[in-house]
Amino acid sequence: MEIQGTRFGTLEFDEKEIIYLNEGLLGFPLSKQFLMFPYGEDSSFFWLQSVDEPEIAFIVINPFDFFSDLEFAVEDEDASSLVLARSEDVEIFTLVTIPEGRPEEMRTNLAGPVVVNVQNRLGKQILCKDYSPRQPLIPDSMRSQLKEQARSSKGGHVAGGR
């Protein structure tokens, strides 16, 4: 199978690679089939590419790579709809937003993780009221340093005139 996307051009894939989000994502109800692939080599980021609407792609992460103290509870109803029998069959991803020109301000939606059964490729976005929908990925102290570095490199470039 293949899709023609605006971001990646032609993507060839096997049907067994599709993740099925039967309820879509919040705000994107028509996108129910997705492909997931690494953002880059050795990256903690992934692309979640809509098969139904090829112009739609999201950056996602495994939130446990960034936040070791997370605990997501998958309600029985959600586990049932995903046909989840074992906790080791679950993978959880969260959507990331990166403001243009301000990567140090990137955030992830911990309040709306996407839960995927890796055995049958069924997934669902669930709601977790205990977490923020705009959780910074970079700690405040490090964010300040990155902002300062960005300012100095821009300032140095402009001052140098070349």
Swiss-Prot record:
Which InterPro entries does its entry note? Flagellar_assembly_factor_FliW, Flagellar_assmbl_FliW_dom_sf
Keyword tags: Bacterial flagellum biogenesis, Chaperone, Cytoplasm, Translation regulation
State one Pfam family annotation. FliW
Disulfide pattern: none
Chief site of localization: cytoplasm
Q: Where in the cell is it found?
A: Cytoplasm
UniProt KW Cytoplasm keyword = yes
Report any one BP term from Gene Ontology.
bacterial-type flagellum assembly
Question: What Gene Ontology cellular-component terms does the record carry?
Answer: cytoplasm
Member of which family? Belongs to the FliW family.
Q: What does this protein do?
A: Acts as an anti-CsrA protein, binds CsrA and prevents it from repressing translation of its target genes, one of which is flagellin. Binds to flagellin and participates in the assembly of the flagellum.
Subunit note:
Interacts with translational regulator CsrA and flagellin(s).
HAMAP family tied to this protein: FliW (MF_01185)
Q: Tell me the protein's name.
A: Flagellar assembly factor FliW
Encoding gene, per UniProt annotation = fliW
